């Protein structure tokens, strides 16, 4: 990248409204960008229509605005990026780095859950088939800005993973890498639930010959049952009233210093102080933590 300026991002999928766990990821990435005098992008990852909730994308953008998390530039919509994904797939194909696969989930489960390369040299066509990366650059470990060196599950890291689904949808790992490169993202701050796919994404960067960003994975907030706060687990949406208490709650979760008189501060002043006091090193190094602290 010719521009050395910090560029971060928050990239939610419109499968429901933002909840407290989402706020942690959004706030962490926002504070890291602002503390580095950088740019903070927002991308809507709307490439999986069966999982999307009508109106959720607009609600997410309104929630971010309500919570004072104002992004730079235009929102990028993955649903408008299909041509870029097709070009990336075509390039991989031209380099001999992809192949079609008709293996079912049942077959992969029967061989232990990790794809074994069964279709790699069969020369199959596109009909009723997924497209897989021909893995030539497995990434067995990477450095996380919070957790240090993280070691991958080696069979998973060496797997020829799907880059275009059998149902015609673009795979998450392909789309996220193409878009992060397009947007010039220099560091990705997100939840620890995305640690596992990181080695696949770095591997894709290497196959394309692109510089991978840095990574910082934040701890996941757990509900009272010990499960991750998520839309699938029916985590409640962020409150619509005064956003400051939830911002303070998220800052506490991230183990950050908070002004004693925060209730006397405006939303903008509270966030400005949070930027000035931001210390990622103080975040708990565990990958999960209770939401109520």
Swiss-Prot record:
GO terms for cellular component: cytosol. The gene is gluQ. Binds 1 zinc ion per subunit. One of its GO terms (biological process) is glutamyl-tRNA aminoacylation. It comes from Klebsiella pneumoniae (strain 342). It is an enzyme of class 6 (ligase). This is Glutamyl-Q tRNA(Asp) synthetase. Keywords: Aminoacyl-tRNA synthetase, ATP-binding, Ligase, Metal-binding, Nucleotide-binding, Zinc. One of its GO terms (molecular function) is ATP binding. It comes from the Bacteria. Its EC number is 6.1.1.-. L-glutamate binds at residues 9-13, 45, 172, 190. Catalyzes the tRNA-independent activation of glutamate in presence of ATP and the subsequent transfer of glutamate onto a tRNA(Asp). Glutamate is transferred on the 2-amino-5-(4,5-dihydroxy-2-cyclopenten-1-yl) moiety of the queuosine in the wobble position of the QUC anticodon.
